[in-house]
Structures are given as structure tokens and as C-alpha cells.
Amino acid sequence: MARHLRIAAAQLGPLHKADTRAVAVSRLRKLLRDAHSMGAKFVVFPELALTTFFPRWWMEDQTEVDARYFEKTMPSAETQPLFDEAKKLGIGFYIGYAELTPEGHRFNTAILVGPDGTIVGKYRKIHLPGHADHKPKAAFQHLEKKYFEVGDLGFRVWRYLGTITGMLICNDRRWPEAFRVLALQGAEIVALGFNTPSENLH
């Protein structure tokens, strides 16, 4: 039986180091409203959508990095308005963020949120690109391996908005095995937010 689901790919644009969570959440809420006005039922936001793409910078004070860029709970008081907006509009979304677990583990994470504003599923990025060592002479750095651990939740699917949906994040898209594992579980949609530089590392 044919099914129709209108999905919006939300282009957030740059977030700067000085931008607060409130700034990011306000922009995300507006994108939700815009997508809803066009009939979308599901919005895919980018990787690490709540902050600037901080793995570009070498920072030595991990305590400061944790406080500034990582989410200890989801939703938090700062991000709850996004979930409330989704519930108000009856629209689901995928969003990426930096997760700090109660045990002190750090992951590049994405979640599926239902149209009732509740979290349906979570995925932690497995294929981390870049490097962990400092390269001060490089044109730019890509330090995901410094700031994140390899994801530990595997490749899963969820029943979501009448479909079977899986999640990946950015660099995961370069490995066909990830899609194959999801397809073998019946995935009909793979939500995949990314945050990619205009120039690649050489």
C-alpha cells in the first residue's frame, strides 16, 4: 500500500562560537515552523546542531569543552522548547548533538523525536573521521577522534511515523555496510544529518 510522508531537510547555516543554546534552539524552532507550514511531518536537522562545529578547534580544557558544547541530559531546560514546539506542531525530527553520559563518555549522537515531543530512538556515530593529535600548521583541524568515542549502540531501526527508520551521522554515509545492516532490518528511511567542511582534509 502506498504511503506518503513529507520530509524536510533543514539547512541550519553556521553557528558561531559565541552563539548560545538559546540562539541555536530559536533557529531550530523557526525551521520546524517553516517545515510545518509546507506540510512536512518529519524534519532532519544537521549533525551537532546545537553548537558550532567545535571539533575544528584544539582545546585543552576538557571541563570547559564539556560545559560549553556537550549535553548532559536531553532534553535539558535549554533544549526543551524545541521539543515543546514539535509537540505543538505535531511534527517529528532528527537532531545531532554532542552527548556526555553520566559515566563520563562522550559521543557524537543523534536522536529521533516523535510528533508528541518524546525521544523514540538514539544513535551514536561509529565512523569518526579526522584525527586526535594536534596539527597546528594545518589549514584546519578535524578532531572528532579527540572529542568523541566510537558509538556503542550499533545500527538500529525504529518504527517511526508509519515507517521503519534508521539513523546515521555524516561520515557513516561513506560505508555501505552501515546501510546494508539497516536495510537487513527493514529500514525504509535512513535519517542522516551531516556537518561537512567546504574543503576536505588531505
Describe each region flagged by the PLM.
Residues 1, 87-88, 159-161:
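Extracellular/periplasmic catalytic domains that process cell-envelope and extracellular macromolecules
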Residues 13-22, 60, 71, 133-137, ...:
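Acidic/histidine-rich helix-loop elements
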Residues 101-189, 193-202:
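Active-site catalytic loop in hydrolytic enzyme cores
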Residues 5, 39-41, 89-92, 163, ...:
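Loop/turn elements at helix/coil->beta-strand transitions in domains of secreted/extracellular proteins
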Residues 21-116, 122-124, 130-131, 196-202:
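Cys-nucleophile CN-hydrolase/nitrilase-fold catalytic domain and related Cys-dependent amidase chemistry
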Residues 1-15:
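Short beta-strand segments enriched in small/hydrophobic residues
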